[in-house]
């Protein structure tokens, strides 16, 4: 028999009660986290979003009706409890619970709902498959660790709004149904019923609208906004994700960076109680690539890349010598204490290198007694070995590993190996927050597949001022274009990009030239971006901004392995929602109304 809630009102959340409440009569609502019968006395751990408290139904003290109902309670039954807060008997305290020194002596118990057999226990550290957790997400979220993550996410929202509103930003919404302007990832398309054959697109970002808001005189805009990208998914990707997006007029890079650092500092202080040191570190894109093998460097550990190209060009080891003669480079990493690696471990490391594009991996062990062990050491003079050891800071007990290839492949492979080694050797400290701004990015890069230059960030990023006057030259010579640097900046935290932005192009004339540089014709530019180009003609102020990946920030703040763990209802890596079975087929009459025919290749049916 299910009881009615009626006029029963909660006084406290379970986790809010303390010893100061001893003697108080309280009313609580929640779920039965666990039920135990000890010699006829029934103990129920009652749970809500704030925590757990023990309630006691003693047949010698509680009303008979309450006791009879308590005997029927099972895990995850929904309960209303009225009783008095009392101190737990000495020796029965539970130090694992914040409420572990008190309990509720029950005077009234209502069973508001029952619960079917659970697919997994409602507790932290479960081993249930992720797809099962997502199918029963309403149960998964009840688990304390999931609840805490969503509460923290809410607190990040609140802190963001407090900080930005306090610094003169206006929260302005931009459209969810907009024009398809595919640059990079695919758009999610929405058919327009009233304009058959035409489609809206869900926005990949509010980029163009926030620039137009600057033209509109808003001056400082922000939004916590959903964005959509139809791309292949990884652990840090979702088809729909949330950005903290802002834009400012009459600013340069320093202004945007100052606001960004202030916001992150405020969020960490308000939500985690952590005082971050400002300003954050900075390094150029080139420095990041050449020291760490990536434009998202993790500064929590060393393992820096060292360049031995000047030595390699003169050695007898053919792989090194030939690579340098062909314009390549030779770089390495000193794995401190790595001489203890077995040959199998080194072979495994070589296979890791090959996964990321290396043809092989050379290595030299410096044994504890100073002797060298390596199949390549015979090709080096003693002077060359000593010089390599000096550059690599090699000492007894170290393992030196080398990659010889093109500039791009060498850095990419060593960047991945650096991360792999840090994880293998447990070099990554916990509870350390290493922020770094990466600046001075190339404006463009060459895309082999498309056979044209593409924007490294997006086509609305301004070149450095010294490069603007050379745009005509760059349009004629891609080598000149590849030397251009942009006014872009990315913020990296512990090896993860958490935000990126730039100073934008605010001149329609320069914007058209950048489109031309990227191989976008006047007709294509007008078709895709005509509304922006037109707006830039009407007194657009200099402006810039940034977008933070909110999901990624919350994942890092909570120590989550995937952003799926900090999103209430995420998609799987295949873009499926197991809870609702979306995406799904729709009815034929819905398609007819839209004027759409679906052609599904046979192999996908």
UniProtKB/Swiss-Prot annotation:
<keyword id="KW-0963">Cytoplasm</keyword>
<keyword id="KW-0436">Ligase</keyword>
<feature type="binding site">
    <location>
        <position position="504"/>
    </location>
    <ligand>
        <name>L-aspartate</name>
    </ligand>
</feature>
<dbReference type="InterPro" id="IPR004365">
    <property type="entry name" value="NA-bd_OB_tRNA"/>
</dbReference>
<feature type="site" description="Important for tRNA non-discrimination">
    <location>
        <position position="91"/>
    </location>
</feature>
<comment type="subunit">
    <text>Homodimer.</text>
</comment>
<feature type="binding site">
    <location>
        <begin position="549"/>
        <end position="552"/>
    </location>
    <ligand>
        <name>ATP</name>
    </ligand>
</feature>
<dbReference type="InterPro" id="IPR047090">
    <property type="entry name" value="AspRS_core"/>
</dbReference>
<dbReference type="GO" id="GO:0003676">
    <property type="term" value="F:nucleic acid binding"/>
</dbReference>
<dbReference type="InterPro" id="IPR004364">
    <property type="entry name" value="Aa-tRNA-synt_II"/>
</dbReference>
<feature type="binding site">
    <location>
        <position position="183"/>
    </location>
    <ligand>
        <name>L-aspartate</name>
    </ligand>
</feature>
<dbReference type="Pfam" id="PF01336">
    <property type="entry name" value="tRNA_anti-codon"/>
</dbReference>
<dbReference type="Pfam" id="PF02938">
    <property type="entry name" value="GAD"/>
</dbReference>
<dbReference type="InterPro" id="IPR029351">
    <property type="entry name" value="GAD_dom"/>
</dbReference>
<feature type="binding site">
    <location>
        <position position="229"/>
    </location>
    <ligand>
        <name>L-aspartate</name>
    </ligand>
</feature>
<dbReference type="InterPro" id="IPR047089">
    <property type="entry name" value="Asp-tRNA-ligase_1_N"/>
</dbReference>
<dbReference type="InterPro" id="IPR006195">
    <property type="entry name" value="aa-tRNA-synth_II"/>
</dbReference>
<dbReference type="InterPro" id="IPR045864">
    <property type="entry name" value="aa-tRNA-synth_II/BPL/LPL"/>
</dbReference>
<dbReference type="GO" id="GO:0006422">
    <property type="term" value="P:aspartyl-tRNA aminoacylation"/>
</dbReference>
<dbReference type="GO" id="GO:0005524">
    <property type="term" value="F:ATP binding"/>
</dbReference>
<dbReference type="InterPro" id="IPR004524">
    <property type="entry name" value="Asp-tRNA-ligase_1"/>
</dbReference>
<dbReference type="GO" id="GO:0004815">
    <property type="term" value="F:aspartate-tRNA ligase activity"/>
</dbReference>
<feature type="binding site">
    <location>
        <position position="457"/>
    </location>
    <ligand>
        <name>L-aspartate</name>
    </ligand>
</feature>
<dbReference type="GO" id="GO:0005737">
    <property type="term" value="C:cytoplasm"/>
</dbReference>
<keyword id="KW-0030">Aminoacyl-tRNA synthetase</keyword>
<protein>
    <recommendedName>
        <fullName>Aspartate--tRNA(Asp/Asn) ligase</fullName>
        <ecNumber>6.1.1.23</ecNumber>
    </recommendedName>
</protein>
<dbReference type="GO" id="GO:0050560">
    <property type="term" value="F:aspartate-tRNA(Asn) ligase activity"/>
</dbReference>
<dbReference type="Pfam" id="PF00152">
    <property type="entry name" value="tRNA-synt_2"/>
</dbReference>
<keyword id="KW-0547">Nucleotide-binding</keyword>
<feature type="binding site">
    <location>
        <begin position="229"/>
        <end position="231"/>
    </location>
    <ligand>
        <name>ATP</name>
    </ligand>
</feature>
<dbReference type="InterPro" id="IPR012340">
    <property type="entry name" value="NA-bd_OB-fold"/>
</dbReference>
<dbReference type="InterPro" id="IPR004115">
    <property type="entry name" value="GAD-like_sf"/>
</dbReference>
<comment type="function">
    <text>Aspartyl-tRNA synthetase with relaxed tRNA specificity since it is able to aspartylate not only its cognate tRNA(Asp) but also tRNA(Asn). Reaction proceeds in two steps: L-aspartate is first activated by ATP to form Asp-AMP and then transferred to the acceptor end of tRNA(Asp/Asn).</text>
</comment>
<keyword id="KW-0648">Protein biosynthesis</keyword>
<feature type="binding site">
    <location>
        <position position="497"/>
    </location>
    <ligand>
        <name>ATP</name>
    </ligand>
</feature>
<keyword id="KW-0067">ATP-binding</keyword>
<feature type="site" description="Important for tRNA non-discrimination">
    <location>
        <position position="38"/>
    </location>
</feature>
<comment type="similarity">
    <text>Belongs to the class-II aminoacyl-tRNA synthetase family. Type 1 subfamily.</text>
</comment>
<dbReference type="InterPro" id="IPR002312">
    <property type="entry name" value="Asp/Asn-tRNA-synth_IIb"/>
</dbReference>
<feature type="binding site">
    <location>
        <position position="238"/>
    </location>
    <ligand>
        <name>ATP</name>
    </ligand>
</feature>
<feature type="region of interest" description="Aspartate">
    <location>
        <begin position="207"/>
        <end position="210"/>
    </location>
</feature>
């Amino acid at each position: 028999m299910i009881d009615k809630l009626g006029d029963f009102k909660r006084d406290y959340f379970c986790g809010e009660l303390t010893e100061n409440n001893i003697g108080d009569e309280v009313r609580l609502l929640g779920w039965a986290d666990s039920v135990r019968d000890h010699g006829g006395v029934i103990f129920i751990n009652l749970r809500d979003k704030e925590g757990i408290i023990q309630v006691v139904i003693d047949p010698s003290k509680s009303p008979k009706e309450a006791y009879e109902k308590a005997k029927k309670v099972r895990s995850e039954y929904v309960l209303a409890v009225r009783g008095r807060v009392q101190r737990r008997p000495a020796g029965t305290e539970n130090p694992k619970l914040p409420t572990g020194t008190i309990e509720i002596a029950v005077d009234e118990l209502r069973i508001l709902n029952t619960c079917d057999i659970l697919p997994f226990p409602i507790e932290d550290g479960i081993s249930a498959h992720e797809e099962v957790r997502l199918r029963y997400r309403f149960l998964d979220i009840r688990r304390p660790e999931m609840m805490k993550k969503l509460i923290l996410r809410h607190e990040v929202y609140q802190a963001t709004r407090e900080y930005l509103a306090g610094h003169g930003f206006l929260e302005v919404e931009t459209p969810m149904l907009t024009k398809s302007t595919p640059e990079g990832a695919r758009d999610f398309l929405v058919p327009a019923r009233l304009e058959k054959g035409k489609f809206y697109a869900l926005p990949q970002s509010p980029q163009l609208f926030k620039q137009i808001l600057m033209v509109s005189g808003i001056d400082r805009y922000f939004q916590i906004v959903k964005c959509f990208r139809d791309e292949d998914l990884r652990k840090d990707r979702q088809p729909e994700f949330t950005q903290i997006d802002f834009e400012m007029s009459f600013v340069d890079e320093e202004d945007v960076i100052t606001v960004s650092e202030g916001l992150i500092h405020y969020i960490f202080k308000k939500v985690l109680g952590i005082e971050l040191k400002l300003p954050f570190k900075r390094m150029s894109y080139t420095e990041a690539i050449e020291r760490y093998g990536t434009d998202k460097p993790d500064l929590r550990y060393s393992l820096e890349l060292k360049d031995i190209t000047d030595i390699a060009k003169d050695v007898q080891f053919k792989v090194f010598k030939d690579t340098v003669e062909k314009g390549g480079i030779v770089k390495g990493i000193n794995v401190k204490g790595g001489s203890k690696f077995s040959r199998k471990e080194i072979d495994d490391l070589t296979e890791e290198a090959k996964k990321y594009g290396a043809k092989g991996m050379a290595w030299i062990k410096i044994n504890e007694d100073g002797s060298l062990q390596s199949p390549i050491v015979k090709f080096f003079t003693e002077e060359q070995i000593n010089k390599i050891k000096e550059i690599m800071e090699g000492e007894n007990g170290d393992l030196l590993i080398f990659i010889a290839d093109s500039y791009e492949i060498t850095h990419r492979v060593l960047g991945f190996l650096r991360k792999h080694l840090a994880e293998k050797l447990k070099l990554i400290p916990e509870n350390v927050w290493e922020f770094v701004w990466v600046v001075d990015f190339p404006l463009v890069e060459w895309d082999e597949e498309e056979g044209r230059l593409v924007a490294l960030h997006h086509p609305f990023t301004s070149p450095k001022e010294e490069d603007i006057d050379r745009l005509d030259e760059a349009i004629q010579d891609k080598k000149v274009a590849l030397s251009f640097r942009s006014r872009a900046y990315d913020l990296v935290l512990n090896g993860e990009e958490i935000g990126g932005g730039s100073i934008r192009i605010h001149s329609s004339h320069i914007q058209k030239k950048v489109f031309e540089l990227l191989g976008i014709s006047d007709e294509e530019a007008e078709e895709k971006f005509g509304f922006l180009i037109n707006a830039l003609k009407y007194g657009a102020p200099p402006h810039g901004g940034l977008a933070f990946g909110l999901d990624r920030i919350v994942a890092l703040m909570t120590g989550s392995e995937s952003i799926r763990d900090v999103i209430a209802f995420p998609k799987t890596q295949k873009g499926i929602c197991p809870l609702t079975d979306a995406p799904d087929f729709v009815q034929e009459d819905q398609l007819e109304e839209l004027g759409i025919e679906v052609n599904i290749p046979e192999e996908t049916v």
